[in-house]
């Protein structure tokens, strides 16, 4: 059963084909994809394919991706989740994006906090990593604010529109008990 997580303002839930328009709106937006290592979506079919990829990720126990829904408007405003899940090594990488109209409202902090906590408690992770374009100042600041530590730079690690970009590597580890 797909886990539903809740915060004061948001519900993290399974993404379905009914969310295709919102996923398309997110991943066809230059401001979102600029630091994503992904070309802009050009069709709703690409959004449906991404939703199916998210479902397979969960079914195959390689990760999980939640849709971020506002409680007040029921609007899907982005996604967050884990990929590169390695249960044996108790680690995963976190990824997230929010549609620009909803930036600067504290939503990213709210969901990162919830998902990191879930990763440590429910999934038994001891390490959560993040890889972020060095140019993505907002996400770099956010991860530090959320308690992640910068571990280094991966040179020419991701390509965006055929151009290589350096990325910062971050991690947060479960506090020792």
Swiss-Prot record:
Coiled coil: none annotated. Its EC number is 2.3.1.-. PROSITE patterns: GNAT. The keyword Acyltransferase applies. It comes from the Bacteria. The keyword Acyltransferase applies. PANTHER family: GNAT FAMILY, PUTATIVE (AFU_ORTHOLOGUE AFUA_3G00765)-RELATED-RELATED, RIBOSOMAL-PROTEIN-ALANINE ACETYLTRANSFERASE. This is Uncharacterized N-acetyltransferase YoaA. It comes from Bacillus subtilis (strain 168). The lineage of its organism: Bacteria, Bacillati, Bacillota, Bacilli, Bacillales. The gene is yoaA.
């Amino acid at each position: 059963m797909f886990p539903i997580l809740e915060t004061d303002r948001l519900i993290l839930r399974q993404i379905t084909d009914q969310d295709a328009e919102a996923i398309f709106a997110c991943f066809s937006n230059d401001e979102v994809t600029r630091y994503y290592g992904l070309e802009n979506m050009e069709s709703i079919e690409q959004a449906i394919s991404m939703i199916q990829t998210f479902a397979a990720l969960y079914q195959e126990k390689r990760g999980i991706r939640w849709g971020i829904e506002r409680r007040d408007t029921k609007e899907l405003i982005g996604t967050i989740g884990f990929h590169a899940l390695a249960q044996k090594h108790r680690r995963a990488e976190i990824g997230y994006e929010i549609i620009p109209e909803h930036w600067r409202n504290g939503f990213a902090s709210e969901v990162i906090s919830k998902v990191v906590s879930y990763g440590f408690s429910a999934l038994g992770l001891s390490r959560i990593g993040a890889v972020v374009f060095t140019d993505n100042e907002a996400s770099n600041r956010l991860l530090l604010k959320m308690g992640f530590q910068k571990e280094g730079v991966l040179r020419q690690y991701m390509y965006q529109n055929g151009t290589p970009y350096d990325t910062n590597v971050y991690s947060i580890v479960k506090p020792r008990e």
